Structure formats: structure tokens, C-alpha cells
Amino acid sequence: MSIAWSSVFKRELRLERFLPRVYSTKVPDNAPRAADNEQWLETLRPITHPEQKKSDHDVSYTRHINVPLGEVTSVNYLQRYNKHKHSQGNFVDVRIVKCKSGAGGSGAVSFFRDAGRSIGPPDGGDGGAGGSVYIQAVAGLGSLAKMKTTYTAEDGEAGAARQLDGMRGRDVLIQVPVGTVVKWCLPPQKVRELVEREMRKDNNATLRSILGSTAVNLSVSSGSHRKKIQLYRHEMAESWLFKDKAKEYHENKDWFKDLHKKMEAYDHSLEQSELFNDQFPLAGLDLNQPMTKPVCLLKGGQGGLGNMHFLTNLIRNPRFSKPGRNGLEQHFLFELKSIADLGLIGLPNAGKSTILNKISNAKPKIGHWQFTTLSPTIGTVSLGFGQDVFTVADIPGIIQGASLDKGMGLEFLRHIERSNGWVFVLDLSNKNPLNDLQLLIEEVGTLEKVKTKNILIVCNKVDIDAEKSESFAKYLQVEKFSKSQEWDCVPISALREENIDVLKKKMFKCARQSEFDK
């Protein structure tokens, strides 16, 4: 189990230890006697009342922070402003999904009846808990294309007579490819409204500048080294459900006022446990390994109490019950980040796809026009029978101004963020390949970011103008710069398969550089 997941599961264990402190005592099980109910209701007195702002029972202190709009949305969902929206086949690597957990079922108001008496003791059962939304990373999936736009767990069923509890709502399980990162996000409609507002203020503003400069205020839990976004459920419309006799009748009775005061404390404890549970990491969940156990995204609401719990020596015929707690509705951004040892980076038509085709089992689309590659392609490279293998990802070409929202390559950098090394592919037939390399470095995040990776420079198309001294001079310029950065450099012709074996060995070394350094 990875460190990230162990922290998630440890948090669930802490929640289990916390719940007894919140409730102080357990709600009596089915068929409670009046004495059992009175004992339980009496223990609610010490629990903090909602009027008090903070106490030992408050489990979630929050504070507010501002984050850029771009961190809580995806440019792919701003279709009107995303000039290079694209797709290829069934490959989808970004989805925004609305998830909703189920509400708890309401407690029942019912009385035991038999032939000897028309009305007996209360026997209304509790409502069932609402279904929860779970997520699990599984091997064998390679795209987010089959994800739905909405996942809704079932509400819990209402309680019934004869102390029958309602059925629990059915859970929802979302299965995603390994390498998926899940982040909380704003609803797409809300984001579009914010972008349109900023566009009206400044017609020259770019989408990327708006996403970077517009602030979104979030409530986050404090007291932890990992910030968590505090999620909130809708407030309960009613705290009681009445049958036969109206709300106004009960509110005028002293015995009900006393009961209501105690149950306010009970409701407050439920709210506190919800606040503790309804949190999501600000940095998101990185599902970089197959999971044997799913993790809960949104927990369903707790079922309401039936009237059997309100039988006391003073209250003989409770014609009321508690409603189920609300579920939770949120939007999440799913981003697939492919897991490959190396990533190919280059200008459009530099020959990346041809290289991948020659060195691996992948069959990417190859053409003589820009943006032939419209989605990432991953190939597996073998150095020979029985020898080591490594994986290589090819992403769309990057053009000048990509960091200013031009082209399409930067949208796919997520697929090589995890890679141990980056392979920059240069077209040696271009006028100035060294300038091309420096442009690529600048567009993907400057030299400082590039230096965090193992780097290999590949000069492709050496067969073109091979007889001219200018071609060799251009290669020497690139090689000199590469050596100054302590990067390896190799000339090849992918089309003619020249120097391909040398390239594969150097790529393997780049992918496993840490092993060679030992």
C-alpha cells in the first residue's frame, strides 16, 4: 500500500474512534424500552449545543483560502473559449463528473396493533442510510471515455412498522484507469459564468490568464499538514416529521420542548461527524496503483430515527420521528496521467510518432502535416528477447506560444509528468534545431523544470541534406549545448531506421538513470 493510500485508510480508522466520543452513548437498538430511551436521552445533555460556537466536540475548524480558478476546473470544459478542443477515437483523458450520495431514509411513525387493542406502543423503525459514492483504480482501463456525467447513489428507504429499519441505499462504484488523479472542482456552468464575467471586463484577456488570475475562495480544514477542502451538505429543511398532530401542537408542549432541546444536541453531533467525514484533499487523490479496496468520495446521509426511540414514561404516544440526513452533491475532475518511463517532446512533424513506431509495438498515426498526433500513444520498447523493457509516451507536438494557450501539446503534458525522463526530438532539417530545443524547453516550463527529469536529445532526419556541411554543423551546435547541460545526444533517421539500436539503448539508460548512477 502506498503512503498516500495508507493515510486515507488511517483517517477512516480515526473516524471510527471518534464517533463514540461524539455520540457519548449508542442509540438504543430495536425494541427499546422506555427506560432505555430515557437513559439515552439523558446522556445527550452534556453534548455541546449548536449555540456554542466552539468546544471540545467541534471536530473541524476551517479557514478560507484563495486558489486560482485554473486549479478547480479544466480548460477542456470551456468549449467556447478552447480553440483547440480535440478528440481522437474513444480516448478521453479529462472528465468532470457530478457525484451525489444518497439521503438517509426517514424514521417511521407507527404503533403496534393487535386484536386486543387498537393502539399499542410505538414501533416505527429507523430509516436506512443513504448510499455512498466510491472510487477504485483498476488495471486494464486506458481511457475515461466510458465514465458517466453523473453518478447518483440511492437514497435510504424509510423505516416501517414493527420496528423494521429501511433498506440502505445502494452504493455507486466508479472504476477508473490506474494513473487517474481526482480533484474537487467547481461546476462547469459556474466556471463559464466566471470566465464570461472576466471576458466582459477585458476583451483582450486570454483564457489562460483568466484561469490564473481569477481567485476562488475555498473553505479548508486546518490543523493538518495536508489541506483538505471542507464540503458542506444542504441544511435540513425540517428537524422533525409529524403524523396526525401538527408541528404547532407539539411546539407548545413543555415535554416536547425538553425533548427537542436534547435532540438538538444529537443533531449537532451528527453535523460534526459529517464535517469530519466530508473533506477532500486540496491536492486531490493520485490513484497511481491498482486498488483492492475502493475509497469513499462522498458518504451517504444517516437514516432518521423512528418513533420507537421516543417512548418514555412521560411520552407514551410519540407521533413524530426524525428525517434522514441529506446526502452530499459535488463535482470532481478526473484527469488521466499515463504512466510511462519516457515522454517524447517535440515540435509538430518532428518525427516523434515515426520513432515510436520504429522502436516499439505501438502504431501511432503518421503523416506529413502538423498535429498528426491528437492523443497520447504509449508503446513498450524491448532491447531484445528476454531483456528489459520500458515504456514511451508520444504526445501532440508543442508549438511556439503553447504556454499562452496555442496548439494542443501542453494539455497532454500530464501524460509525461510521471515519467522518469523526457526525450526531446528535433528535426535536423529545420533551419535552427538549437532554437527549436530552447523553444521547447521554455514552453514546457523553463530549464529549471526540465532539469528535474532525465533528458535525452534526439536529432532526427539526419538523412536529409546529409551531404551538406550545414547539417552536421547544426548537429554539433545541439550536441555542444546538450553537453553543457550534461545531457546525452544522438543523431538518427527514424524513417530509414538508422542508429535506432543506439537510440533504444540510450533511451533505456535515460529511463533507468537512477539505476545507472548507483
Curated annotation (Swiss-Prot):
One Pfam family it belongs to: MMR_HSR1
Protein's membrane topology: Peripheral membrane protein
Superkingdom assignment: Eukaryota
Entry's Gene Ontology cellular component terms: mitochondrial inner membrane; mitochondrion
Subcellular location, principal: mitochondrion
Chain ranges of the OBG-type G domain: 340-512
GO BP term, pick one: mitochondrial large ribosomal subunit assembly
Transit peptide (residue range): 1-23
InterPro entries: G_OBG, GTP-bd, GTP-bd_Obg/CgtA, GTP1_OBG_dom, GTP1_OBG_dom_sf, OBG_GTPase, P-loop_NTPase, Small_GTP-bd
Sorted UniProt keywords: GTP-binding, Membrane, Mitochondrion, Mitochondrion inner membrane, Nucleotide-binding, Protein biosynthesis, Transit peptide
Residues involved in GTP binding: 346-353, 394-398, 460-463
Domain Obg span(s) in chain numbering: 89-339
Miscellaneous: Present with 189 molecules/cell in log phase SD medium.
Alphabetized PANTHER family for the sequence: DEVELOPMENTALLY REGULATED GTP-BINDING PROTEIN-RELATED (PTHR11702), MITOCHONDRIAL RIBOSOME-ASSOCIATED GTPASE 2 (PTHR11702:SF31)
Family according to the record: Belongs to the TRAFAC class OBG-HflX-like GTPase superfamily. OBG GTPase family.
Subunit structure: Interacts with the mitochondrial 54S large ribosomal subunit.
Protein name: GTPase MTG2, mitochondrial
Gene from which this protein is expressed: MTG2
